[in-house]
Design a protein with these regions (language model features):
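Membrane-interface interhelical linkers
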Residues: 1-66, 76-85, 136-154, 186-238, ...
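Residues that define the loop-to-transmembrane-helix transition and helix capping
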Residues: 29, 89, 115, 178-182, ...
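Membrane-embedded alpha-helical segments of multi-pass transporters/permeases
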Residues: 40, 44-48, 107-108, 130, ...
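Loop-to-transmembrane alpha-helix entry segments
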Residues: 95, 111-131, 150, 263-286
Length: 289
């Protein structure tokens, strides 16, 4: 459980760092790209090895790591588009709703436990995710976007689910039960290389402006980003079922982020939001039974 709590803490810290980017004039995509190479450095310091070595190329997890690197970059881009066209609330809800894919996948494909308490907790978790993210006032989201752009939030949801399902697959095939840093750094390296290609085109075309501020932001972002994935894999490797780990992680992140936002950033919550927090606590209790 301690590994799961550490993963949640790192993920919450990521959200707070993102919230500060606009205040300090950070270019989000460039910071994300530099964050991936920071994660690579963390993996090198942790394991002493760099990705794509001759030994790593023969590992059974290599194709999955390459796939995840691509999905990471794609998921970030679609999440950013969702924020642009539908708002932050829709983007966050669609990403957290990935448990609608992950939990049934773990239960149906791998036969993980699905008792009444877990199913009730699963339902409460879904309700809490929606209520905690419920806007305090009406916000313009899909009004002027039409049906032509509905694929953007739907793709955000699907990609978030794909990431978690691949982790479930890797866990059940005992490829990285102990959070192999080579597996993690390969994922981030693949995403970083793809991101560097995009940034390189942006710099060459003049669409992006290089700034050391973005490099520094990427370093600050990369350390907890690496930790969030490492500790999640270690939690799964310790024997915790994926159908338990992912809902707890998603609900825990929303719960901790909401409370932190109220204390640190003085964000106001509606009565509906507080009901969502209460349901999140109840969901954690039922899922943990």
């Amino acid at each position: 459980l301690i590994y799961l709590l550490l993963s949640i803490a790192c993920s919450v810290l990521l959200g707070f760092i993102f919230k500060l980017f606009a205040r300090f004039g950070v270019h989000t995509f460039q910071a994300i790209m530099f964050n991936y190479f920071t994660c690579l450095a963390c993996g090198w310091l942790h394991s002493g090895n760099l990705p794509f070595s001759e030994a790593d190329r023969g590992e059974p997890w290599m194709p999955y790591a390459l796939l995840l690197g691509l999905v990471f970059i794609s998921g970030f881009n679609t999440a950013a588009l969702t924020v642009r066209y539908f708002g932050v609330t829709v983007s966050q809800v669609m990403q957290k709703m990935s448990i609608l894919l992950t939990v049934p996948f773990a239960i149906l494909v791998y036969g993980e436990s699905s008792g009444a308490a877990k199913l009730l907790g699963f339902a409460l978790a879904l309700c809490s995710i929606v209520l905690v993210n419920w806007p305090a006032s009406k916000q313009q989201t899909t009004t002027n976007n039409g049906l032509g752009r509905l694929w953007i939030p739907l793709l955000t949801w699907v990609l978030a689910g794909v990431i978690e399902m691949v982790f479930v697959l890797v866990q059940h095939n005992r490829m990285t039960d102990q959070g192999d840093p080579a597996f993690i750094t390969t994922i981030f390296s693949t995403a970083g290389i793809l991101g560097l290609a995009v940034c390189g085109f942006g710099w060459a075309s003049g669409r992006f402006a290089f700034s050391w501020r973005n490099v520094a932001a990427g370093v600050v972002l990369g350390i907890p980003n690496y930790g969030s994935m490492l500790f999640l894999l270690m939690a799964l490797g310790s024997g915790m079922e994926a159908s338990l780990a992912f809902p707890l992680t998603n609900v825990g992140i929303i719960l901790a982020t909401t409370i932190g936002a109220v204390w640190l950033f003085e964000e106001r919550l509606s009565a509906v939001n507080w009901w969502g927090i209460a349901l999140a606590v109840a969901a954690i209790v039922f899922i943990s039974v």
